[in-house]
């Protein structure tokens, strides 16, 4: 029996955060046995905002090495760099022709990014969700892990796929209609200084962010200064509405130790101050990341291995993608290359 197909990508722009790890990358490793996983480093998406070429080059290799370091197995999953599989851009162009301007102009992320990068609001940024749709539809993905910021894009991918199928292949649909993958455990990590906002790797205030490769001393320092509250006496309780800072730290501690919120609350019942709890959270996060960081350094220094992973991944991905692209080209009436 074939496994459900999953597609997910990671951007090689900026340092990946612990939020990227807990919310996506660790999940990637856990899904490999039960799903047919397609994982890509989405460098085509990265250039929708201006990138330094050398920095993008290095960040792409960094992201690939991180995927491997967290446990993505190239023998179980298809791991590749997006620009190495030209079918993504080819299908993206076709899908552009079946996407309405009004649909794209309603995308919340475009509004947010165009405000942030007001000096470079390019067509690629506007059409970003269409390329994302191509990423998904090329592989017949049944499920797509998405955060709240990408949910609208997945809905658009579903609309584009349905529209194309209805025009060209209502009886035998070319595109699979993807569903969101909902993780059993919510691993949403919030900003350290303002726990009402999601942690973002691109946050200008670096005190808000813990990066995946961050120095242990820096991690502990940031957590020691993280937002708590002024409740007297101090109370460790998972209450997102009234104790957002403590709830965020509890989430990190739970992710790092495997303890439930109830167990954490019992462990710290009757505390006189938040300092000892913060100390334990910092040490637990460092212990969680240390093996990943060590494995990353080993893999990142083995360029021959990275090259082999990229080469094999691109070949596997392209073979799958080409099957879909041929069906699409035939459906719209393109003449096949002799």
Swiss-Prot record:
Binding residue positions for ATP: 11-13, 19-20, 147-149, 189, 198-202
GO terms for cellular component: cytosol
Name of this protein: Tryptophan--tRNA ligase
Residues annotated to bind L-tryptophan: 135
Subcellular location: Cytoplasm
Catalysis: reaction(s): tRNA(Trp) + L-tryptophan + ATP = L-tryptophyl-tRNA(Trp) + AMP + diphosphate + H(+)
HAMAP family xrefs: Trp_tRNA_synth_B
Name of the gene: trpS
Keywords associated with the record: Aminoacyl-tRNA synthetase, ATP-binding, Cytoplasm, Ligase, Nucleotide-binding, Protein biosynthesis
Gene Ontology biological process terms, A to Z: tryptophanyl-tRNA aminoacylation
Organism per entry: Vibrio cholerae serotype O1 (strain ATCC 39315 / El Tor Inaba N16961)
Subunit structure: Homodimer.
GO function terms (MF aspect): ATP binding; tryptophan-tRNA ligase activity
Short motif 'HIGH' region, span: 12-20
Protein task: Catalyzes the attachment of tryptophan to tRNA(Trp).
Motif placement: 'KMSKS' region: 198-202
């Amino acid at each position: 029996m074939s496994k459900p197909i999953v597609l997910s990508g990671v951007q090689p722009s900026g340092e990946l955060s612990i939020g990227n790890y807990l919310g996506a990358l660790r999940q990637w490793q856990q899904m490999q046995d039960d799903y047919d996983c397609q994982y890509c480093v989405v460098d085509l998406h990265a250039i929708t905002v201006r990138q330094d070429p050398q920095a993008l080059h290095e960040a792409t290799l960094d992201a690939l090495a991180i995927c491997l370091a967290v446990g993505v197995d190239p023998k179980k999953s298809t791991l590749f760099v997006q620009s190495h599989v030209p079918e993504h851009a080819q299908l993206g162009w076709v899908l552009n022709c079946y996407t309405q301007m009004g649909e794209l102009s309603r995308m919340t992320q475009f509004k947010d990014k165009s405000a942030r990068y007001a000096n470079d609001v390019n067509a690629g940024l506007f059409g970003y969700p269409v390329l994302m749709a191509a990423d998904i539809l090329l592989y017949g993905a049944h499920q797509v892990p998405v955060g709240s910021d990408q949910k609208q894009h997945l809905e658009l991918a579903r609309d584009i796929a349905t529209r194309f199928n209805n025009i060209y292949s209502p009886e035998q649909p070319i595109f699979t209609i993807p569903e969101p993958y909902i993780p059993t455990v919510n691993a949403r990590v919030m900003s350290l200084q303002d726990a009402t906002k999601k942690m973002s790797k691109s946050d200008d205030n670096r005190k808000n962010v813990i990066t995946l490769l961050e120095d242990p001393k820096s991690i502990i320092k940031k957590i020691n200064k993280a937002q708590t509250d002024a409740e007297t006496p101090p109370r460790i309780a998972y209450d997102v509405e009234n104790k957002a800072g403590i709830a965020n730290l509890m989430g990190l501690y739970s992710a790092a130790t495997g303890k439930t919120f109830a167990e954490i609350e019992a462990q710290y019942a009757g505390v006189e101050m938040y300092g000892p709890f913060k100390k334990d959270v910092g040490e637990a996060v460092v212990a969680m990341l240390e093996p990943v960081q060590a494995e990353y350094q080993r893999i990142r220094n083995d360029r021959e291995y990275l090259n082999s992973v990229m080469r094999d991944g691109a070949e596997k991905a392209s073979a799958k993608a080409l099957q879909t692209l041929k069906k699409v080209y035939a459906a719209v009436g393109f003449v096949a290359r002799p």
